[in-house]
Amino acid sequence: MKDSLVLKTIQEKIKNLGSLPGCYLWKNELGQVIYVGKALKLQSRVRSYLNPNQKDRKTRALFVELYDLDWIATGTEKEALLLEATLIKKYNPKFNVRLKDDKKYPFLCVSTSEDYPMVFLTRKVKDNGDRYFGPFTDVKAARDTLELIHRIFPIRKTKLKLPLPKPQRPCLNFHMGRCLGPCQGNVTKDTYSELVDEILRFLEGKKERLVADLKKAMMDASSKMEYERAGFLKQRIEKINQLREKQTVVSMDGGDEDILGISKREDEGQILILEVRGGRLEGKKSFPLTGLSFSDDEEAFTSFLRDYYLNVTVLPSVVYLPTSAKGNYDVFLEAILEKFGTSIKLKFPEMGPKKSLLRLAEKNADLSLTERILATKLRDQTVAMKELQEKLNLPTLPRTIECYDISHFQGSLPVASGVMFVEGKPYKPGYRHYKMRGYEGINDPGMIHEVIARRLSHLVNEEEPLPDLIVIDGGLTQLSRAAEAANALDLGHIPMVGLAKKREEIYFPGEKHPYSFDQHSPMMRLLRNLRDEAHRFGVTFQRLQRKKKALKSILDDIPDIGASRRKSILMYFQAKKKVTDATRQELEKVQGIGPVLAEKIFTNIQNLKKIEPK
C-alpha cells in the first residue's frame, strides 16, 4: 500500500496545477526523477496516476515507486513536447523510453554560409546558415559518404578562409581534377555555387533530377565547344549513375520515404530506419533504445519520432510504421509543421510492398539488437574479469574460473557439481559431476573439502593447468574447508573465494568478515552467473540420481517383478529414461508383462515423475 501521507501530499500539490499544458516529473523516495510526461491539462493527467487499481502495467509499477511530484507549465502542448524531450535527456528517467546513447551522432555539413563552401563532418549543429545532413548512426558510413562526395564533386577540401588576399599555389587535388581551385581564384562564385547546389541535391536524395540537370549542362557545354567542362560533367554523371545502379529500387513512385522497424527484448530495443530516396533504398540507420520494459510500440515510436525527426535537417515525405504503433501523433505532426514549414505523412500499411519493407526493417532491427547485446555481453565479460583481478587482488586475469556447489535431497543422495567459465562464458567440456558417498546427514563443508581435493589432485596427476580462480558456493565454513584441501596438496597459492547466498557477499580465505561489492557491477553479475550455473547443473544431476534410485526401487517393490522381468524391461527399452516415458501399451509388449502388471508399472512411474528436488 502506498503511504497515505505521501498520497495526501501529492494530492495537495495537484490542486495547484490547474488545466495548464506542460510537463510533469514523478520522483522516487530518493528524489530521483523516474518518469517525465507531457499533458494538455496537467491536473487531470497527473491525477490519473494515483488510482492504485491501474490496469496499465507501467502505471502500476510507477505507482509503487512514486513519492513526489514536480511540474513545469508551458504555453502550448507543442512546447510541452519539446520540453519533455529535453527533460528526458537531462534526467534519464527509468520509466521513459529513450535513446540509449547520449553521444552526439555526426552530421555532414555543407558550409553554405561561406562564399566558397566545403563539406565536412561535425557533431555540432549550429544555427549559422550552414546546411546539415544526418544524423549518421554509423561513423564509417558518414566518412564513406564524405569520401564519395569528394570523389564525385570537385569541391575544396582545405580549411581556408576564402577568398584569400593573394592566390595560393595549386594543390595536388587541383592537378588531379578533384578541386576547382577557389584558393587560386580560378573559379567564379556563380560556377562554384552551381557545384554546391549539385552536392545539396545529391545529399537530399534528388539524384535522378540532378543527373537530368547535369546531362542538360553537359549538352549545353558541348554545343558551346566547352569540351573540357563537358568531359568533367560526363564523369560526374557516370559516377552518380554507378552509385544509383548499386541501390535497390523499392518504390516506383520515386518518393522519399522512411520505413521504421522495431525489435525489443525486455528493457532493451532497437529501431531501424530504411531510407528510401528517389524510390531507391539508399541506406539504413539503427538507434538503440532503453526503458522498454513497461512500454508498448506506440509509446516507443512516439518518443523516437519526437527525438529523431525534430532534430533532422531533411524530412522524408512519408514515414511508414508497423500497425502496432498506431496512435495519436497530432502534437508531433504540429511540431514538425511549425519547425519545417511542411509536414510528413505517417502510414501504417497492413499488406503489400510497404508491409514487406516493414518486415525487412524489423528483421534488420532484430539483427542490429542481437549484435549490440552480444557486443555488450562481450564487453561486460572483459570488464568483469578485469574487475575480479583488481578487486580480489588476483595475480593474473581470471580467464578460467571454476565454481563448486553441493546438492542433496534432505541429506540423501548428495552430489557435487563443478562448472567452468572461460573468458567469462560457460565452457561445457569443463563441467564435472561428483557423487558423494559415506556421508550421514547434511555435511556441505566436508563434501566441498572432498570435491576440491579430488578435482585438484586430478589436475595435478593429468598435468593440466590449474584454474585462475575457484569460487565456492557458500560462506566462511565451506570456503575454509576448500582452502584446507588445496593447502594439503602443497600447490602454492590458488586464488579462491566464497560467495554467500544471503547477501551476495564475498569471503576470502583466512578472513572472518565478508566484503560487499556493487551488486550491479559486471564482476558480481559474472560471479552470480557462475554460482547459478553450478547450482542448476548440480540440481539437474541430483534429480537424475533420485529418479534412477526411485525407478529401481519401483521395479523392485512391484509384486511379480523379479530380477528376470526387471532385466527384460530395461533391456527392451535400452535406457531407463525410455522406461519412464513408456505408455501402458508399450509396457505390455515386454515379454512376461501383461495388462495388469503394465498398469501397475505405469502408475508407479507417473508418481515418480511428480518428484521435484528442493
Curated annotation (Swiss-Prot):
Species of provenance: Leptospira biflexa serovar Patoc (strain Patoc 1 / ATCC 23582 / Paris)
NCBIfam families: PRK00558.1-5, uvrC
Listed name of the protein: UvrABC system protein C
Subunit structure as annotated in this protein's UniProt entry: Interacts with UvrB in an incision complex.
Pfam name, any one: UVR
Entry-linked PROSITE patterns: GIY_YIG, UVR, UVRC
SMART domains reported in the protein's UniProt record: GIYc (SM00465), HhH1 (SM00278)
Name of the gene: uvrC
Family, as annotated: Belongs to the UvrC family.
Lineage of origin: Bacteria, Pseudomonadati, Spirochaetota, Spirochaetia, Leptospirales
Subcellular location per the Swiss-Prot or TrEMBL entry: Cytoplasm
